[in-house]
Every structure is written in structure tokens, then in C-alpha cells.
Amino acid sequence: FGALGAVFAFFIAKNGAFITEIVSDIIGSKLENWQTAYIVGGVLGLLLLLMRAGTFESTLFENATTTQVKRGNFFMLFRKSHIKKYLACIVIGLPVWFVVGVLIALSHKFFPEILGLTTSDADVKILKTLSVPTPEMVMWSYIGLSTGDLLSGLLSQLFRSRKKVIYLNLMGIAIMTLVYLYGPTGSQNYYRMIAFLLGAVTGYWAIFVTNASEQFGTNIRSTVAATVPNFVRGGVLLITMGF
């Protein structure tokens, strides 16, 4: 549910003045917007740290620390026996950031083409009444993403297979992308629903990272779990350039 931070950020941006007033009353002096953001972010970070304080490693990982096996060596992933699996794990996650980084984040560029509008004054007015602001599209997609993450975990338990659930999500992304770009036009609520569903079908991040790490031995699982998501996020640059 970490993605809900983006939802919280939307409400902070929308009601920033109100929150600034509350914080200013507490500390007795007026704050700039960036100072409010620092305080809110710092408090949330400390709360997250407290919630993680009770976590512990399994005995499997604890036993690995007492062996002489190399641990956390990133370059081990480039061995012939590992590189194909490692690249495949990265590719599986790229559609998530294609949806979030392109379809949702650049929705303000898609709406004129989706709605078949031009730059005329009349069409600009229509665009304002039918399109959804990008921050709100992000909010709805992240609510969907959090919901999808929960459902994908439950479905993987039900099917006893993460692979099947990931296949379902990838097919869902393909279908919803076509509906979003080439489907019928609708009202703002229709596009809010589309943003939510796009987020829901990309909600396999947790099982994607878990699946990636479990392809490798315990000595490099933490390295895989840390680097695969970062390469996927970095892939947004190539995706947007290619798009």
C-alpha cells in the first residue's frame, strides 16, 4: 500500500494551505510550502520506520550469513546461468511503468487525440469538461494499483501460482490500454474508472518482486529484489523516449 502515498500527496497538494495553517498554529510561525512538505514527509518517514521495526529475517537467511558463500555480489547476476533470468525478470515489470509513466502521467497529451479534439477555442472548452486532470488520474490509478496489489496476492494464493496471476495482469494491461486509447469516449467519471482499472491491472508489483527474487539463491536474493525494481523504474526513460 506504499502507492497510496501518491494519493495522500494529491490531497496534500489540493489542501496544502489548510495543512500549512494547522502546522503553523502548532509551531507558532508561518511556514513556506516546501517547509510543510519537509515536515509532513519527515513525520511519515518516521512512522514508516516505526512500523518496520518489528520485522525479522527467516532462519534461511540467517543461516546464510554464517557460510562462506559470496553474498550480494551484483556481478554474479551477469553469469551465463543468471543473466537470461535476470533480464526476463526486468522485462516482466516494464509494463507497470509504461502504464504509470506514459499512459497516466502523460494523460493530458492523450486526451485531445482520444476525444478527437483540435486546438480551437471551442474544442479547448470541451476538453476541460471531459478530460480529467493528470494529478487526479495519477490518484485514481494508484488507488487501483493498491487494490490490484492486494487482489494479486490473494489470487496467487488461490491459484497456487504467481506466474498465472502475472499472465492475467499482463493480459489485463493489454486490454485496458486498447480500451483507453481506442475505446469509446465518455465523461470524466468514465476516465476516472479507466484510470482505476489501469492501476488495478498493473497491481502485481509485490508478486513481481517476490517472483524475481525467488529465481535466485539466498545469497543474491536481496540484490535481485533491490536492483530489478530500480532497472524497471529506470526503463521509464527508454520507454518515454521510444514512445
Residue ranges, per PLM feature:
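Symmetry-related core transmembrane helices of the 12-TM Major Facilitator Superfamily/SLC fold
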Residues: 32-51
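Flexible cytoplasmic inter-helical loops of multi-pass small-molecule transporters
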Residues: 53-74
